[in-house]
Amino acid sequence: MKTLRLAIHGRVQGVFFRDSMRREAQRLGIAGWVRNRTDGSVEAAVQGEPAAMDAIVRWSYHGPQHARVERVVIEPDDGSYNSFEVIG
């Protein structure tokens, strides 16, 4: 399993990004979490099989309908997750 940390910048708060990402992650079988950050970005930790991880990363570049993603920063993460949750 692969685990990544994503920092998603742009108009990503107040557009149901976290809940939409939770639904997409659950559909893909991805575990981890997503939360808003105080700087206006969204941060997520995602863990899953390579094809599912590629799909959630691609999804994060556009997000839900009203989001306007400007940039996604991707870093490795060493967490281990069992489900996908919206936190904070």
Q: What function would you assign to each model-found segment?
A:
Residues 1-88:
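Intrinsically disordered, low-complexity, mixed-charge
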